[in-house]
Amino acid sequence: CLYVRFGSFTNFLWFQDTLDRWGGDIRNLVAQRGISYGLNQRTQKQLVLQQSALGRLFGEAAVADAAIVGSDMFLPEGAAMGLLFQARNSLLFGSDVQRQRREALKQNPTAREEQVTIQDRKVSFLSSADGIIRSYYVADGDFHFVTNSRHLAERFLQVSKGQGALGASQEFRHARAQMPLDRKDTVFAYLSDAMFRNMAGPAYRIETTRRLQAAADIELAQLALLASATEGSPGDNLQQLVQGGFLPPDFGQRPDGSQTILGDHGIHDSVRGARGFFTPVPDVEVRAVTPSEAAAYARFSAYYLAKWGKIDPIMAGLRRELLDGGKRERVFVDVQMSPLNSQTYNFLASKLGRPDQVQLAPVRGDALSFDVILHQQRLFGGFRDFGPPTDAAGEGLLAAVGLLPFGRLRDFLYGYVGTVDGSLGLLDFLNRRIVTPPDAQGYSATQREIWRRQYDRFTVYSLHYEILAEVTPQLRFEPAPRPAQFRLRVGDISENRMAPLANRWLFTRSRETSLGNLRLIHAMMQQLHVPGEDAKAAAETVLDGTLVCPLGGEYAYRKSAQGGGWWTSTALEQTGARSTPPPNFQAPPLSWFRGLDLDAILTPSRLSAHAEVDMQLPK
């Protein structure tokens, strides 16, 4: 299973707050996305577990520990997952859970609560007709489990009887030996081999394929409903949409007998419910398969066994500490695949050399540097902190980031690469192009000005003579905190001299994303003839998400004097057509990333990485 333990209620709140800070999508750390699926909010709504101000205040007094348990990670469609709490005060915690469930019943007329029997126990099951609420609540002593999956509720009760506990497995005991409790991780995550095998099994795989088809059918039906409404055609049911030519004649025919339904609660699947809140995969019984499904699974299974064979258990530990008076946070992350199967180890070991516990000392002026020990070579390199050429702005933004002839591209390849102790390996293709003998200081070059310098133990190449002159005297080894075969160091990119150009490029990307959302809304108005004020909501219904302006603005409908109107973003109204960001704009990761140190090691028993990330906390 998937197991994520927090160790305390405070850590659990930090995890939730971090997700909320980035719109519930960790990918927003790299670049702001144009659509939010609100996955964290969806999960809380479905489980009927909302964090209140009072709960935050007294949560630590009521909850000793918390964990996420699941059997897959299909969050956009609806994952099989639950929240497990160890209560300090079971009466207080249980009362709060029951209070939230009573409030949900009052607020949702279609919601109902029933007592279902699971493992000879009465379990509270709260559900709504559209599947948006689906919550099993069961307690055993001080352990309280809230889940959207009957299968997981059953597993919880089985474990309470001592049957099939994760903690009893040899793999998990090995994981905890590698990452023991005394590390005091903020978050500990474990993905077992059994979870991967279960997800690759026939029932799970086939139902996963079916639910993807069900989601596609719902989206198609929503588009058909919009088209019929704007054309004034009947659209009270799917049959009318088929007769009107908005859906194909064979629409909705699926092997398991499920179908798309257009009813009082919108468009949903007859077996799985509303899109984004689908019934968890393990709760949908696969009773029979078609020949085409069997053939498709056979192809998948053959590919899986040939390419993956066995996915090793994955464990991760995350710890954090505040820096700079609470203005920054350093996050320590350890990730391991262990135990490592021989096939994976042999493949990687054939590429890598033996780990050692020395590293290249930081080179002054490097924005990024790496060091990797290969089979017969130690390769290192760096990218220097430099300002863009003074005429880069005149070349246009795409030209400025490197889409130029070689004569200008070299101005942006401002770095170096080298090796140690004469073994050229991958760099031999550069060495063969050297046409001049080394001078007294070890410099030589090709006809196209690729420079090489042989300095002490090091052989270093660059497109720039001055880089070799700056870097090579600084090259030396120093003790490393851990043995490793790969090391990566990245400085504070917000202070990099290339940061303004990077911010400009990221602003342009974000601006295009915002404009892309507006084009979609415009298409709703022009092609489907959706009324202007309703066009954004219609687009969000089709996408099953919320359109977000990555520039930080809000989408707004503006009416014209002639009676029409258009959609725009308040941020775009302020910036206009300019391609340069406003003074207060700082795109991710420039807004938060302040440094990274990473190292990785391969041994016969494990593949592991350790990273330390410095993050700027929002004001």
Sequence positions of predicted segments:
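Signature of soluble extracytoplasmic/periplasmic domains of secreted precursors
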Residues: 1-619
